[in-house]
Each structure stands twice: as C-alpha cells, then as structure tokens.
C-alpha cells in the first residue's frame, strides 16, 4: 500500500466530479500557491537540491598534502588520512606522522593542515600531538564536530598493540577555534575503561534526526579483549562518553582464521529515517571479499546480528574505506576497488541509501592506494551559496601506497 504524502489532499471523491465548495476552493488556492512556489527561484533551488539528475561527479583539483620519506619534519611515513569540515566551513586534514618507520607501532605525531578557501590552499603542517618515544605510540583515529557548540573532537588510541606497554587508552583532544589551537589530551579510561578501542579511522557523526537527535557517535573496533565493532556515544556535546553495545567477531575472543566473521575498521553515516549505517572492513573475508554493513535503529545504543549484511557490489581488499551521506540523500563511498590488492582508488555513489550503487564510477587513482576518508562541503560558505563539493583524502603512491597522502576535490554536479 502506498502511503499518502504528508499534506496531500485528494481532489474530490471517487465516483463523483470534483466540486469547488468552500473546502475545495481553499484546496485549489493552496495548490496554486504551491505551483507558484515551485516556479520561484527558491522553489527551483529546493528541487535542485534533491535532483539526482544533476549528480555527475568530476575531479576538479588534486594536490599532495603530505609526502613520506623524511621530507617533512624528518617524518618517515605519513599514513591514516582523516578529513572533516567544521560547522564554520573550514577543512581539517589529519594524518599519523610516523617518526621512524612505516610500522603501525612506534612513536608518532598527529599532523594537521587547515584550509579556509574550500581546499584551494592549505596551512603548513602543524604537529598537534606528540607521543615522544613511545614504543607503541598513538594511532588515529576519528574526528567529529558538534554543530551546536562548534567544537571539533579528535580521538586516537595509545598502546593499541601492547608492544612495550600494558594498558591501552582512548585519548581525546578538541578545538574550539576550527583547529587553530587544541586542548591537552584527555584520557577517557575513567569513563570507558582500558579495553583497546581503535576509533575509525575516519569521521564520527552527529545525529541530525530522531532518535537521539544531536548525539555524537564515534565508531571503531577492538582486539581480542573486545573484538568486533562498537561505538562511543555522547549526549551532552562531548562532555562525557560511553559505549553502546557492539557486534563481536566469531569466534569471540579467539584468534581468527580466514573466512571467520571479524568486522574491523569502520565508518558510520546517518540515513534520513534516523538509522545509522556502519560500513566496515571485512577483516577475514567472511562470506565475500566485500564490505560488511551494519545498521542501528536506536542511534547505536545497540547493534543487532540480524541487521548485519554484506555488500557484494563494494569489492574490497581488506582496508579502511571512506563513506559519507550528503544532506540531499547521496551516499558516497571510496576504496581501492579490487578484491586482493590496494590499487584503483574509486569513488562510487548511491541514490538508494546504499542498497544499490550507480554503475558509473570515478577512478581517483589507478595505482597503489590505501586508506581513504571523505568529507562534504554543502550549502552556504562565507554567506554565499555554492554547489556541493566532496573531498577525498587518500593514501597514494606509484610503487607503494604509503608514499604520500593526496587530496582530490570533487564537484558533485560536475561544475567548475
């Protein structure tokens, strides 16, 4: 049965001609007003905002933000890109600056660059967190903004691999001035304990619709102590944090083999019905060489096994991927589109909440490519309306994907 659209009024009744009594005359006046509104500039703009026929993604610019090989601050390797747009329209790009080697372990900085002109120019690299000479240093991470307060939160983990250390910690820094300055690190162990939680890598979200409108959600994965995917939640603008329940790997708490169920690095986004989709790395290729998709209907208080699916269209070589939902209902997804190797960084999009994907794709880079992160810039920027832009920050190389981190700017409507 097709539901009647809110506010729709039937003209007349079946079996009898429509009569313009007082009620019908009023309805006719309403429909005339709506018709005139749709012809107005405001109405045309509103329709264009959700007109999927306008969507023709086009890469309009690309630039390297970081190059590995001790070329920037004697950093050996830059990895794990994160990108976000702040409520004020500033772009913030983050990466792990691995001091001595490309290893996931070892000492690191968190590198940051800012753009205030929609990605055209970027500030010099700033190192906003330094873990010293820690043998099992920091690992990024997830970034999320609160649209009410304007605060940007950045999460990372310490001692994730228990290499030369015994206690894992989830750490948090924040900025109240669009990334110009940052707080001292806050250890969340008193709030959430010391089980290893690896945020992201990618972006968190703030709920835009009920249930729990305004909630901040940051999802990640654990290890043998608490493997699988689970999320950190805040209902007080980031003052306090707690875990929602998660989806565990199978067999739980034991080493995994090929084809075991083991969801890993993940990226959440919200659908217009208020549900949250978590697109996750399929660490052991359970069921397919593709992405695991989880869905929560209560703002990530719970994740249920019956709401876990697999997306065979999103072929994946076991990697952290980018995913984002635009305000007009488009879902974008980026990953190295190959079943085995980290090559062919590809952008895909969906007009059906991710239940299917358009046949058209945009190849961002054909060669070695690894992790990627997505952000959008929509609506008014600096008081001026603009066409929506998508930003793809990704690991890129000619021989190895760890050679650099590059930014591709994509015009969603294909306009320059």
UniProtKB/Swiss-Prot annotation:
Subcellular localization(s) per the UniProt record: Lysosome membrane; Lysosome lumen; Cell membrane; Cytoplasmic vesicle
Record flagged with keyword Cell membrane: yes
Short sequence motif FRIP motif: positions: 78-81
Keyword terms, alphabetized: Carbohydrate metabolism, Cell membrane, Cytoplasmic vesicle, Glycoprotein, Glycosidase, Hydrolase, Lipid degradation, Lipid metabolism, Lysosome, Membrane, Phosphoprotein, Repeat, Signal
GO biological process annotation, one example: ganglioside catabolic process
GO cellular component: cytoplasm; cytoplasmic vesicle; lysosomal lumen; lysosomal membrane; lysosome; membrane; plasma membrane
Lipid bilayer topology: Peripheral membrane protein
SUPFAM superfamilies reported for this sequence: Sialidases
One function term, GO molecular function aspect: exo-alpha-sialidase activity
Motif interval(s): Internalization signal: 413-416
Sites carrying sugar chains: 187, 344, 353
Active site (catalytic residues): 104 (proton acceptor), 371 (nucleophile), 395
Residues that coordinate or bind substrate: 79, 98, 265, 281, 342
Intervals holding BNR repeats: 113-124, 173-184, 232-243, 348-359
Leader peptide range in chain numbering: 1-48
The reaction(s) this protein catalyses: Hydrolysis of alpha-(2->3)-, alpha-(2->6)-, alpha-(2->8)- glycosidic linkages of terminal sialic acid residues in oligosaccharides, glycoproteins, glycolipids, colominic acid and synthetic substrates
Subunit-structure text: Interacts with cathepsin A (protective protein), beta-galactosidase and N-acetylgalactosamine-6-sulfate sulfatase in a multienzyme complex.
Family, similarity comment: Belongs to the glycosyl hydrolase 33 family.
Function text: Catalyzes the removal of sialic acid (N-acetylneuraminic acid) moieties from glycoproteins and glycolipids. To be active, it is strictly dependent on its presence in the multienzyme complex. Appears to have a preference for alpha 2-3 and alpha 2-6 sialyl linkage.
Protein's name according to its UniProt entry: Sialidase-1
Organism the protein comes from: Sus scrofa
